[in-house]
């Protein structure tokens, strides 16, 4: 009798243990279900924190320039907003058209910051203006996943055929107007004068943009093709062509823009100086071709003393110009 009681107790204990285990499993499953997002997020971000990201591949138009607003980076796990800006700049500057990077677990606002940056067209335009026109975007797509992966896709402004065509034209122009005895300032002036003497401002395209807030997609006045091949340009066409010339001289430079205008700025002899071809090629009532040098290699104070409307740039984007 005593023997059977022991067996019964053991059997009962075994049943209770099985029930307890089942109960604990159910509780565990409930907890996992309730916190499934957090658990998955923790697991995935732990993995993404350790994913090795190689730098974007570089083409011939990448520049090793470092600016106050953005610089090249080899850190593709951002820890703050500036890191994201540097990743965007590095990707564009490299000439890459598809690149991914990853948020880290300890950067809790990373995805929100990427979204904010992707919706800030002024900021994106500023980064775009700092790279070679050949690497600049026509359209930029930035997407994110819930678990920290960000992807950049770039639809470039210039096609490969257009780049070859422009480069051939640049070499042709250089052979005619540049010689080895010229100083850097002389070469800059030669490029400035050539573009103005062979280009007129495209008033029709400017009026179309003013009315429709867009321009004919077949019109090339907003690109270097306009002034170099068609003799017509908007401010973006002048500045793209001039930037390509300045890049040939390996001078740190970028385009600078406001809501209504864009021009060039470069670092020469220890100073940041502005060049505005559009305003040195004024539209006249009799359509005569006028060449000015009012906006050639001038500092920011002189620039703003000449015009405070179209040239009133956002100083927070260009700290070196203050």
Specify the residue positions occupied by each region the protein language model found.
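N-terminal Sec-pathway targeting helices
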Residues: 11-29
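Hydrophobic/aromatic-rich core segments of domains that either
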Residues: 236-303
């Amino acid at each position: 009798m005593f023997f059977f009681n022991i067996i019964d107790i053991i059997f009962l204990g075994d049943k209770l243990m099985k029930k307890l285990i089942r109960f604990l499993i159910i509780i565990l499953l409930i907890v996992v279900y309730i916190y499934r997002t957090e658990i998955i997020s923790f697991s995935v971000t732990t993995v993404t924190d350790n994913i090795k990201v190689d730098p974007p591949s570089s083409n011939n138009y990448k520049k090793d320039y470092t600016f106050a607003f953005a610089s090249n980076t080899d850190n593709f796990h951002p820890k703050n907003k500036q890191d994201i800006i540097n990743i965007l700049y590095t990707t564009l500057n490299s000439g890459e058209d598809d690149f991914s990077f990853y948020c880290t677990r300890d950067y809790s606002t990373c995805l929100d910051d990427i979204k904010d940056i992707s919706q800030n067209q002024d900021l994106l335009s500023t980064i775009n203006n700092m790279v070679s026109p050949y690497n600049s975007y026509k359209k930029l797509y930035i997407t994110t996943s819930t678990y920290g992966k960000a992807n950049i896709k770039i639809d470039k402004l210039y096609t490969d055929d257009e780049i070859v065509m422009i480069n051939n034209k640049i070499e042709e122009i250089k052979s005619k107007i540049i010689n080895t005895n010229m100083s850097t300032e002389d070469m800059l002036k030669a490029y400035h004068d050539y573009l103005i003497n062979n280009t007129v401002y495209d008033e029709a395209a400017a009026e179309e943009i003013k009315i429709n807030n867009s321009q004919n997609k077949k019109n090339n006045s907003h690109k270097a093709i306009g002034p170099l091949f068609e003799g017509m340009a908007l401010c973006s066409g002048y500045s793209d062509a001039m930037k390509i010339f300045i890049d040939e001289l390996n001078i740190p430079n970028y385009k600078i823009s406001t809501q209504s205008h864009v021009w060039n700025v470069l670092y020469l002899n220890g100073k940041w100086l502005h060049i505005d071809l559009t305003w040195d090629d004024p539209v006249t009532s009799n359509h005569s071709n006028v060449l000015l040098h009012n906006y050639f290699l001038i500092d920011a104070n002189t620039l703003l003393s000449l015009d405070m409307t179209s040239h009133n740039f956002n100083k927070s984007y260009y700290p070196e110009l203050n």
